Swiss-Prot record:
Catalyzes xyloglucan endohydrolysis (XEH) and/or endotransglycosylation (XET). Cleaves and religates xyloglucan polymers, an essential constituent of the primary cell wall, and thereby participates in cell wall construction of growing tissues. Its main location: secreted. Induction: By auxin. Not induced following darkness. This is Probable xyloglucan endotransglucosylase/hydrolase protein 25. It is found in: Secreted, Cell wall; Secreted, Extracellular space, Apoplast. PROSITE patterns: GH16_1 (PS01034), GH16_2 (PS51762). The record marks D106 as: Important for catalytic activity. Xyloglucan binds at E108, H121, T122, N123, D131, R132, E133, Q197, W198, G202, R273. Its EC number is 2.4.1.207. Residues 28-218 form the GH16 domain. Belongs to the glycosyl hydrolase 16 family. XTH group 2 subfamily. Glycans are attached at N112. GO terms for cellular component: apoplast. It comes from Arabidopsis thaliana.
Amino acid sequence: MDRSTFILSLLFTLTVSTTTLFSPVFAGTFDTEFDITWGDGRGKVLNNGELLTLSLDRASGSGFQTKKEYLFGKIDMQLKLVPGNSAGTVTAYYLKSKGDTWDEIDFEFLGNLTGDPYTMHTNVYTQGKGDREQQFHLWFDPTADFHTYSVLWNPHHIVFMVDDIPVREFKNLQHMGIQYPKLQPMRLYSSLWNADQWATRGGLVKTDWSKAPFTASYRNFRADACVSSGGRSSCPAGSPRWFSQRLDLTAEDKMRVVQRKYMIYNYCTDTKRFPQGFPKECRH
């Protein structure tokens, strides 16, 4: 273990009480791991808890959240997005803490006209401040089959992944005065809702309600993570690989290829938005 990893591990031990160990959750069922929080019946758990669907119509969307809160971990979920003309809809899938100074790790999938590519929107909030958007066109049809969308969150960095391919990294640069999510536990949330005022072509394309209900599907949830409860966090026995995991050269190369080919917006290159200079993290 190198010095920086040792120091981060020590800080983690001091700030997170690990008095109770638990086994990681593998492919937890939706009826035991999640609560459907809104939608008046538009969210459904099916197939003995193995499948969850969210629906949106003109009256309402729907959403769910995990029963547990996590403080660091590797979170995986398979999603199949709204097919056909999904313009104006947003499928949000994200980790978020409570309060006015919340932390958040955010996937949003912006609906499209039939035949156009989906836009995958990512963002990181720290202490209630976001404005760190990166957007991608997916290199496959995310409505034809299930694909895995993952977040790796440890003391070193946050990594967004699609089918185990890293697409974005947000590093812990607290030594530069940049806030990093490390103290506030987060739940996993997802929702399907109407955002046609901005979601598709900046709001030019509105939701076609004749195509409703719109439906997104979820399966194969996995959380290999530290579970927070009552101010204490319980972590997997042993030394979980994800806790000290960094991107190796192969993973970095894959991420650069995705960013070069499929990234359509990066706040770190938006000179109109930041005429006085980019945020400090953009240099790393």
